[in-house]
Structure formats: structure tokens, C-alpha cells
């Protein structure tokens, strides 16, 4: 994954946030980082949740004054060859989102129908409740301008599951930043355990209503 990402643009650098992965990911990335100054890693002792991992990565990038900050899965679910399209799109936007459901089309591979219906329905639900003008609010392939992340009080971000993606896009949108979607094909890994759980689903169900209320009361 790392060589494929670095090959897309000479200015790209990589940060891997490792939550104590049992498969040795942290040690592998450490070895790569030791010989490649464009590769970096944050080690966390245990799994603290998707949202806090992204926040840690955002803070790291902001401290080092990167102009653009990407987030993406590290298992080829997100195709690194699409990165140049994100870089082109961000010239006219503030946040670029990779959309699995652009204009109502479904571009997902290796998901059972139950998971697909849950995800697709969740995005319709989130759009209806919050008014967020995107087809795919829960996707994790994004590019942010630095000033977007700087404008958001990262300490106040409450979501830690997939609702985190909705919350970050909603906060950016409510601040007047331009969101732009580009279609992607999401290929789910065929090995490993899904991070989806009842707790994550419950968080997403209620968080969109909190976001709606915060938006109405100017608290985002």
C-alpha cells in the first residue's frame, strides 16, 4: 500500500496511525519509516476508536503545516491511483469526498446485501436529517484543506465510529466550506473482521439528530 500511495505524487507523505495492530503492522511501518523520510507512524497502545485515530492524524498533520490532509483505508479498499483526481478536484473545493453512491449509483464490491442496504440507507437517513448535500457521508476516502481542519474545534468532535465521517463533513459544510464528491469504487477486504457493531450503529442513529440541533443552534 505504501509504495502505491507514494507513487501517485512526489509531494505525498504518509502517516500510519497504528492502534496496537496484532498483525505486526506497526513494526513493518517502523522499518519502512527508518529508511524513507516520507513515511511516518503514530503508535497507540490499544484500539481507541476510528474517530480518535483520525483526530490524532489530523493534529499531527496540522502541527507540521501540511496544506492538504487525506484520510483513507490502508488495505486497498480505497484505490491509491485515485489520489491524483482528488488533488485535481481540491483546487476548486475545500473538502473532496470519495463517493460510493454518487448520483444514486452503488459502487461497492465484496459487501453482503445486508451491509450494503445498511450503508446506503444510513446515507439517505443522514442526508434527510442533517441536510448535508452529499450522497456518501460515511465514506472514509477524503481530502481536506488545512484551513478546514484548523477551523474545526477537534476537541469538540464527539463521534468515534462511522458517524465521525458525517460529523466532520457536516461541521465543514456548516462553516461554509465547499464539499465536492468524486465517484469511487470501494472494494472491501476479504479477510479480517468488520469494525461495524451495534454500538457504532446506535451512535450514528442519534448523532445525526445532535448535528441537526447543533447546526440550528450554531454550536458546530
Give residue ranges: language-model regions.
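Short, conserved SAM-binding/catalytic segment
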Residues: 32-36
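Cell-envelope/extracellular polymer assembly enzymes that use nucleotide-activated donors
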Residues: 13, 167
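Catalytic donor-sugar/metal-binding loop of nucleotide-sugar-dependent glycosyltransferases
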Residues: 132-133, 156-160, 169-185
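C-terminal, non-catalytic tails of nucleotide-sugar-dependent glycosyltransferases
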Residues: 206-220
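A conserved acidic beta->alpha catalytic loop
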Residues: 18-27, 76
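Short, well-formed alpha-helical segments that are part of the catalytic scaffolds
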Residues: 1-7
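Acceptor/aglycone-binding surface of glycosyltransferases and processive sugar-polymer synthases
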Residues: 38-40, 44-63, 68, 80-162, ...
Amino acid at each position: 500500500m505504501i509504495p502505491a500511495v507514494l507513487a501517485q505524487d512526489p509531494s505525498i507523505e504518509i502517516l500510519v496511525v497504528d492502534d496496537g495492530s496484532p498483525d505486526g503492522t506497526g513494526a513493518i511501518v517502523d522499518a519502512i519509516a527508518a529508511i524513507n523520510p516520507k513515511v511516518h507512524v503514530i503508535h497507540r497502545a490499544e484500539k481507541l476508536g476510528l474517530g480518535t485515530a483520525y483526530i490524532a492524524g489530523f493534529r499531527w498533520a496540522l502541527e507540521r503545516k501540511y496544506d492538504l490532509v487525506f484520510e483513507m483505508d490502508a488495505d486497498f479498499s480505497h484505490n491509491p491511483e485515485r489520489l491524483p483526481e482528488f488533488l485535481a478536484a481540491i483546487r476548486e473545493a475545500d473538502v473532496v469526498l470519495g463517493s460510493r453512491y454518487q448520483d444514486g449509483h452503488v459502487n461497492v464490491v465484496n459487501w453482503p446485501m445486508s451491509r450494503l442496504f445498511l450503508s446506503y440507507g444510513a446515507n439517505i437517513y443522514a442526508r434527510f436529517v442533517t441536510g448535508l448535500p452529499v450522497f456518501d457521508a460515511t465514506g472514509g476516502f477524503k481530502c481536506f484543506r488545512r484551513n478546514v481542519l484548523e477551523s474545526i474545534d477537534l476537541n469538540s468532535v464527539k463521534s468515534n465510529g462511522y458517524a465521525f465521517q458525517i460529523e466532520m463533513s457536516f461541521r465543514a459544510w456548516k462553516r461554509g466550506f465547499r464539499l465536492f464528491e468524486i465517484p469511487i469504487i470501494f472494494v472491501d477486504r476479504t479477510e479480517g473482521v468488520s469494525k461495524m457493531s451495534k454500538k457504532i450503529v446506535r451512535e450514528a442513529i442519534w448523532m445525526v439528530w445532535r448535528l441537526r440541533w447543533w447546526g440550528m443552534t450554531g454550536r458546530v
